[in-house]
Amino acid sequence: MTGYELESDYGSMFDGTNKNCKESILELQFTNSTADGTFHKHVLHFWVAPGSMSGWDEIRVSDMMYNEFLKEGRIAEGNMYDARAYGSMMFDDPYYYEGGHILGYNYDDIYDENSATRYNYRKYMPSTWSDYAQNYVGTNMPLMRYANVLLMKAEVYNEQGHPEKAIPLINEVRSVHGKLPAMTGSDQAAVKAQIEHERLVEFTLENSRFYDLRRWGKLDEAMKADGRTGFSASTHSFLPIPLMEIQTNNEINE
């Protein structure tokens, strides 16, 4: 695939400042403008924001997700965690103590010892408080990014028994988006584990996790770990075939 590149500022793809960038292959289009008489806005920013920001605190960063973001430690440029952590969530870190990195505010302006959680998603919040404070916002939602192409290609190479071809693709995403050094490990199992980690931190809140887990055969394990005991991968992995299709096509076997 040509004509696309990874965007160096990961968070800008989700805060409305870098719509339809060089990495974007397909994204849902929203706008704050109502000049044409139409309304193309959403309220996802309120779903992810904590109550202290007048948010609904409904879509939270899980403990698992938080730990995954920080699991490699401060190995990124500037002695930071994976840069995607800062583009995806607000958490207790010196980066957020000053400089107004939370829509012009600092960590202690948003959280105190009584906060229900000490971390929330930053992804899909607009870049400024004035935009955030609107009831509806016009930030776009990426559906397919070039990073996904690279990591899918890496996964294919690895499944074909060529981890050496997958590693440079993984490292490209790590370097540009995470500001991270090259991955460690070189065998097929290590590369598979790295791909699973990269996809989790790269595409959080981008609707890929269910399909990744299904492809890897890990849906039951993940759902049970989250307390979803009523889930069964054999029953719930795919949507049912519409009855009309079954009735009109004798070749369909339920």
Language-model-derived ranges and their functions:
Residues M65-G73, V149-L151:
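Active-site-proximal alpha-helical segments within enzyme catalytic domains
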Residues L44-Y66, D109-E113:
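Short, cationic low-complexity segments
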Residues A49, E58, E68-K71, D131, ...:
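Intrinsic disorder/low-complexity segments enriched in polar/charged and small flexible residues
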Residues M1-H40, A76-E254:
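Acidic/polar-rich alpha-helix caps and helix-coil junctions
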Residues V61-S62, L70, P242:
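Residue-level signal for threonine
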